[in-house]
Amino acid sequence: MANRANRHAARTEDSDNTINYVQCDGLAVMKMVKHCHEESSNMDLAQGALLGLVVDKCLEITNCFPFPKSGDETMDEELYQLTVMRRLRRVNVDHLHVGWYQSSDVGNSLSLALLESQYHYQTSIEESVVVVYDTQKSSRGFLCLKAYRLTPQAIQMYKDGDFTPEAFRTLKVGYESLFAEIPIVIKNSPLTNIMMSELNELLPEDKGHNFLDLGTATVLENQMRSLIERVDELYQEAVRYNKYQQVVFKQDTEKHRALAKLAAENAVRTSKGEPTVPEEEVIKQFRPMTAPNRLTATITSGQINTHAQHIAQFCSQSLAKLFITESLQNAKEAKETK
């Protein structure tokens, strides 16, 4: 284990620490899935730490453990994490902190809290990633496990602490360029693969009765409700920004009018041989307006885009099932009439 740690430290110093893909052990995936589904029953957000090491620009996640619930005020989270990693080290388990994971809310993981947490992780542990598990989509039979890292532009913007429209334009940052998705693969040991093959033979054959189930009741409703809420939030942000622009325009108009008046007065003073008044005296009367924070609006736009993509994907699948069901029903009715 010490050799692994030394190898990892040397690689961290010599390379640029970029991650090409994430390799996750099946045991770590099962732990994450179990924790996220347990917390989803209580409508809580599940979060935990990822342990592993970096090998040739591949981030290997070999273990994980959950964070304590935020409601427990007596629990010191930092001390808890250090204690767990120390005990894992004693039993010769990979204990290097390489990131964190969390469950997803209605298929949308982008949030201000996620951005802040990943920024602190990535600035302290450069190769760290955040793994997001979508409980709702996975419960319908589609394993949804994605890994993300902040882009260099997003990290630079957070370091500067400048979230004005000018900063977004200068760094060319939008909701689509806040995070970069890293490919993730799941790897099992040969013994696990053999066991899975044997278990697959013991399972009864699925007749596929639920393949044409539309299932539009809750999924589409939740996505539409979340989409409407995000659109309302974006509208409020747009109203605030429009008010800011109106105030800035009004202030600029008054400043130009005052400067023009001062220029005329200075011309009269010059003709009379009197000293002129500097323009700084007028400019000091108009303090520059503080530009609003556009980070919230950018994140909300990303959430709207994600919800729209999920709704479009879900509707396209449901429409395909609907047409197939209609054809089968017509064929069944035609057969019965004969």
UniProtKB/Swiss-Prot annotation:
GO terms for cellular component: eukaryotic 43S preinitiation complex; eukaryotic 48S preinitiation complex; eukaryotic translation initiation factor 3 complex. It is found in: Cytoplasm. InterPro entries: eIF3h, eIF3h_C, JAMM/MPN+_dom, JAMM_MPN+_peptidase_M67A, MPN. Gene3D superfamilies: Cytidine Deaminase, domain 2. Pfam families: eIF3h_C, JAB. GO terms for molecular function: metallopeptidase activity; translation initiation factor activity. One of its GO terms (biological process) is positive regulation of Notch signaling pathway. It comes from the Eukaryota. Keywords: Cytoplasm, Initiation factor, Protein biosynthesis. Residues 22-154 form the MPN domain. Component of the eukaryotic translation initiation factor 3 (eIF-3) complex, which is involved in protein synthesis of a specialized repertoire of mRNAs and, together with other initiation factors, stimulates binding of mRNA and methionyl-tRNAi to the 40S ribosome. The eIF-3 complex specifically targets and initiates translation of a subset of mRNAs involved in cell proliferation. Belongs to the eIF-3 subunit H family. This is Eukaryotic translation initiation factor 3 subunit H. It comes from Drosophila erecta (Fruit fly). The gene is eIF-3p40.
